[in-house]
């Protein structure tokens, strides 16, 4: 099970993680939540229906990683499609941000509980329910997209990542990117089996 998710009876998934892996995953999930931002909290006396239909931003984010996490709905440069993308963003981005934040928070909470349970043991087996597994899958995907954007990874140079010299300053993030990819792939395989 080391480093690969496996099925749990009744659904869900499990993976063995050591203390370093737990620390890295937690740190990355917290950084992702910080990147996504805190979100808008409705006023205590606000109309719940109005809060449900609150409008979000209409312009794409300037940060390339956020732009990757929250892309335009339509990729064409025509004025009509830019306006449609703006409207789509206005009505969907807040909910999408909230879901991505919640997925990352599920990761942090699971790792915090795991760390508390395994104190002093050097690692533990993380067991996820089916719902937690889906949240983890979303968070792992968001982490890979973010790191891949920061590293400027393209399909064409994917193989080159495996051959970076140890002296390359990108090497630690590339290793995290590749490891997250392997975790994500094993979780997908587990959930589909």
Regions found by a protein language model. Name each.
Residues 1-110, 114-126, 132-193:
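Charged, alpha-helix-forming regions
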